[in-house]
From Swiss-Prot:
Keyword Cell cycle: no
Gene name of the encoded protein: mraZ
Protein name per the record: Transcriptional regulator MraZ
Entry's localization field: Cytoplasm, Nucleoid
Entry's Gene Ontology BP terms: negative regulation of DNA-templated transcription initiation
GO cellular component: cytoplasm; nucleoid
Family: Belongs to the MraZ family.
Length: 145
């Protein structure tokens, strides 16, 4: 599982270090690579362990090819996916289309989201986090059914 927020830089070639805690979690789970794709709700890159990606692909393959809404989502987001390996320094190379989608500049933020990881441009992340969540949209994680 991935938790926490980590500030890093991304270089001109699109390389950025995956936080050590995330690398350790991947290694402990026997996950040698990650899959990067567009995050559908914000301009961010979503990083998924290979096993989580495989679950997603299985669901996609079970969908009807006649479901236009589903197919549009597959075309838009799943087709943006790139399998990437970490280099010997623990860095990932974020492909140019994903860097452009997320507006990744120099300063980036890795955010652990449980089973997945998000990668944001620092300015966009700060803006998103400074916005208040309307009271009717706040989720009570501790409420019992």
């Amino acid at each position: 599982m991935f938790f926490g927020t980590f500030n890093h830089a991304i270089d001109a070639k699109g390389r950025t270090s995956l936080p050590a805690k995330f690398r350790e979690a991947l290694a402990a789970a026997g996950e040698p690579r990650i899959v990067l794709m567009q995050y559908p709700h914000w301009r961010a890159v979503q990083a998924l362990p290979q096993s989580v990606w495989n679950e997603l692909v299985k669901k996609v393959m079970e969908a009807s090819p006649l479901d236009a809404r589903w197919q549009r989502n597959v075309l838009k987001f799943v087709s943006s996916a790139h399998e990437v390996d970490l280099d010997v320094h623990g860095r990932v190379l974020v492909p140019p289309p994903l860097r452009e989608w997320a507006g990744l500049q120099k300063d980036v933020v890795w955010v652990g989201m449980g089973r997945t990881i998000h990668l944001y441009d620092r300015a966009a992340y700060d803006e998103q986090m400074s916005a208040e969540i309307p009271a009717d949209q706040v989720v009570d994680f501790f409420r019992t059914a």
